[in-house]
From Swiss-Prot:
It comes from Homo sapiens (Human). Keywords: Cell membrane, DNA-binding, Glycoprotein, Lysosome, Membrane, Phosphoprotein, RNA-binding, Signal, Transmembrane, Transmembrane helix, Transport. Glycans are attached at N27, N54, N60, N123, N141, N165, N476, N496, N572, N603. This is SID1 transmembrane family member 2. Its main location: membrane.
Length: 832
């Protein structure tokens, strides 16, 4: 058997030797080389050049070594392979270096520079050798240049700025070591020009270092950059108490918002990029200390807890004032011999500010309808109470319906309901006409607002919290800091959170929302006590007290704080709807509350109101996903916006006394014919018409703006529609209140003035624009700025502080605006 197998073995050995002779080199040239010397040599498939370098490595001094290679022959054949063999690492690269871009584009680089990874040494000092092998499979000679040099500025120092140049084939990285007592630093990299696009990476001191465009994202933290980048680094994340700052220029600029270069038609043809060099500066500075975190949290708590203290002081003052008022009333009642009782400011004086007005009176009203509508006598339809008696509450008979209608006119609630078309279509209405329903029924109706929004909050918030935690986990695991749009120059991490300060600043919404709920609870308790003791002012005077919408508003403010904090865990394009959803809720609830004040019986139910808000949020999601540059979407949305505006205008103008059915167009034509063609008659409800015309002008203008401009930030555009309508209605309400002869008391007046000022400052900080997800992450970082408050909070944090205070103040305005009517009979309070 052995004799038979021997010829085959000899044949196999001969075959291997022949292959080695063809594939392997015949000559190996090994030479001792020196630093800072340029070697110009040739290599081919028959020759391998090996350069031997040695240098002294010390424990306390880190020295960088850089290898520069330039191939002088421009050939498309076999490239040169450079292999650097070190004690604990091997680096290999080919020249010309080919890097891939999008769509597998090829970019070729003749000149390549690489920094060698320096493994740490345990000895005090030792001599280390490394070898540079140069080989190729090209049969012809290829000339190249080789130079190995030391890097004197390889180690970065705290507070010292260092500038350098880099290209895609000549990446740079530097080492930073944490000084004693420093637990966190921020690495800032800047450049005077935006392009070429570059990548900044923070990697642990390990070999190999990933410093090429095609592998820089494999490890560590990284972010793209145009002119500005910043990464906060914590000592606890690096066991060696040091890290590498890696700077890589990308082959293409699309990741930074740039355009793709021209690509040749020849298949697989390399692209000549020309001179894509970028000059950058790196600065490592100490980040904030733990004392800054403590002071930031104490400052945040101090600001908003002071509102609690101020509320307690005002409550004590109001309690003292009420006790004093009660005592004076008791003294007056105990001294009837004085001839005339003491008249209090909050009682019904004979010369009240409402005397002399007859807003909305009818001419020639028969005696049978005197109880239904207050008569003004001689046909003067101007505002005022001329010729009207203004009897004290105590002298009027109580009616369960709390209206200006005499009990003899209506027998049952069913009769009243059957006459809605008569009551609600009068030319001039009073609150008593729209406050006929049972108080207990209305109370339950408006409490549903609170319970519904609480349920919505739970079901909406839980998946949001889960999602943003997942986003933060992905950022921490992958190191990709382009996922979230922070203000990286003022992003202070805590635990797993990357920007704790942006989350902390939302605490104001939660604390002030809770405070508003406590204020509403106290008001409701006081009102219920007044009802229990049959206080006639509570029963028959002022705007009917329904607190359900106020509870819903306070809950919405708290949820806005929670969801805004969730959004700022990882702010980006897809998460922004979390920040705006409850803003839509707040705007809608405020408008409903304004309408409810004068229309308590005909306000929208909680189910229909939240259904409409759900439709708004639905369109918000559609706009975020499909609205960017989509003309068809904007056409459909603008049409729906205009139709919804017209339907709501009709509903408000006719107080709900109209029907949307098949005969609607016939009725519209009939009204146009009778009121516009046969005779030109003005609108029956002038004030409502003025409001609705202004509202339609604004909404049609916003619809036209959206259709023409098609803004990228659809969620903010939708929010602007809600805010504009709310401000319009708010201004109309205040103007009509003053026009009706009503007054604004001191506390709501102060709230209006202070809230307006705070809103002005808040909007100033909001429009600073520290980041924007409408651009690429690299472009967004160009807007980043340093902290401006306590070295801990930035402009957007101040927006959170001020806007939460402004929203709280706006809620207080809604709560106290009609306090001057608390002693005015409801049949003397106008509806507008």
């Amino acid at each position: 058997m052995f004799a038979l197998g021997l010829p085959f073995l000899v044949l196999l050995v001969a075959s291997v030797e022949s292959h080695l002779g063809v594939l392997g080199p015949k000559n190996v040239s090994q030479k001792d080389a020196e630093f800072e010397r340029t070697y110009v040599d040739e290599v081919n498939s028959e020759l391998v050049n090996i350069y031997t370098f040695n240098h002294t490595v010390t424990r306390n001094r880190t020295e960088g070594v850089r290898v520069s290679v330039n191939v002088l022959n421009k050939q498309k054949g076999a490239p040169l392979l450079f292999v650097v063999r070190q004690k604990e690492a091997v680096v290999s690269f080919q020249v010309p270096l080919i890097l891939r871009g999008m769509f597998q584009r090829k970019y070729l680089y003749q000149k390549v520079e690489r920094t060698l990874c320096q493994p740490p040494t345990k000895n005090e000092s030792e001599i280390q050798f490394f070898y540079v092998d140069v080989s190729t499979l090209s049969p012809v000679n290829t000339t190249y240049q080789l130079r190995v040099s030391r890097m004197d500025d390889f180690v970065l120092r705290t507070g010292e700025q260092f500038s350098f140049n880099t290209t895609a084939a000549q990446p740079q990285y530097f080492k930073y070591e944490f000084p004693e007592g420093v637990d966190s630093v921020i690495v800032k990299v800047t450049s005077n020009k935006a392009f070429p696009c570059s990548v900044i990476s923070i990697q642990d001191v390990l070999c190999p270092v990933y410093d090429l465009d095609n592998n820089v994202a494999f490890i560590g933290m990284y972010q793209t950059m145009t002119k500005k980048a910043a990464i906060t680094v914590q000592r606890k994340d690096f066991p060696s108490n040091s890290f590498y700052v890696v700077v890589v220029v990308k082959t293409e600029d699309q990741a930074c918002g740039g355009s793709l270069p021209f690509y040749p038609f020849a298949e697989d043809e390399p692209v000549d990029q020309g001179h894509r060099q970028k000059t950058l500066s790196v600065l490592v500075s100490q980040a904030v200390t733990s004392e800054a975190y403590v002071s930031g949290m104490l400052f945040c708590l101090g600001i908003f807890l002071s509102f609690y203290l101020l509320t307690v002081l005002l409550a004590c003052w109001e309690n003292w004032r009420q006790k004093k008022k009660t005592l004076l009333v008791a003294i007056d009642r105990a001294c009837p011999e004085s001839g005339h009782p003491r008249v209090l400011a909050d009682s019904f004086p004979g010369s009240s500010p409402y005397e002399g007005y007859n807003y909305g009176s009818f001419e020639n009203v028969s005696g049978s309808t005197d109880g239904l509508v207050d008569s003004a006598g001689t046909g003067d339809l101007s505002y005022g109470y001329q010729g009207r008696s203004f009897e004290p509450v105590g002298t009027r008979p109580r009616v369960d319906s709390m209206s200006s209608v005499e009990e003899d006119d209506y027998d049952t609630l069913t009769d009243i309901d059957s006459d809605k078309n008569v009551i609600r279509t009068k030319q001039y209405l009073y609150v008593a006409d729209l406050a006929r329903k049972d108080k207990r029924v209305l109370r339950k109706k408006y409490q549903i607002y609170f319970w519904n929004i609480a349920t919505i909050a739970v079901f909406y918030a839980l998946p949001v919290v889960q999602l943003v935690i997942t986003y933060q986990t992905v950022v921490n695991v992958t190191g990709n800091q382009d996922i979230c749009y922070y203000n990286f120059l003022c992003a202070h991490p805590l635990g797993n959170l990357s920007a704790f300060n942006n989350i902390l600043s939302n605490l104001g919404y939660i604390l002030l929302g809770l405070l508003f709920l406590l204020i509403i609870l106290q008001r409701e308790i006081n009102h219920n006590r007044a009802l229990l003791r049959n206080d006639l002012c509570a029963l028959e005077c002022g705007i009917p007290k329904h607190f359900g919408l106020f509870y819903a508003m306070g809950t919405a403010l708290m949820m806005e704080g929670l969801l805004s904090a969730c959004y700022h865990v990882c702010p980006n394009y897809t998460n922004f709807q979390f920040d705006t959803s409850f803003m839509y809720m707040i705007a809608g609830l405020c408008m409903l509350k304004l309408y409810q004040k004068r229309h308590p019986d005909i306000n929208a139910s909680a189910y229909s109101a939240y259904a409409c808000l759900a439709i708004v949020i639905f369109f918000s999601v559609l706009g975020v996903v499909f609205g960017k540059g989509n003309t068809a979407f904007w056409i459909v949305f603008s049409i729906i916006h205009i139709i919804a505006t017209l339907l709501l205008s009709t509903q408000l103008y006719y107080m709900g006394r109209w029907k949307l059915d098949s005969g609607i167009f016939r009725r519209i034509l009939h009204v146009l014919y009778t009121d516009c063609i046969r005779q030109c008659s003005g609108p029956l409800y002038v004030d409502r018409m003025v409001l609705l015309v202004m509202g339609n002008v604004i909404n049609w203008s916003l619809a036209a703006y959206g259709l023409i401009m098609r803004p990228n930030d659809f969620a903010s555009y939708l929010l602007a529609i809600g805010i504009c309508n709310l401000l319009l209605y708010f201004a109309f309400y205040i103007i009509m209140k003053l026009r009706s002869g009503e007054r604004i008391k001191l506390i709501p007046l102060l709230c209006i003035v202070c809230t307006s000022v705070v809103w002005g400052f808040a909007l100033f900080f909001f429009f600073q624009g520290l980041s924007t997800w409408q651009k690429t992450p690299a472009e967004s970082r160009e807007h980043n700025r340093d902290c401006i408050l306590l070295d801990f909070f930035d402009d957007h944090d101040i927006w959170h502080f001020l806007s939460s205070i402004a929203m709280f103040g706006s809620f207080l305005v809604l709560l106290t605006l009609d306090d001057d009517l608390d002693t005015v009979q409801r049949d003397k309070i106008y509806v507008f």
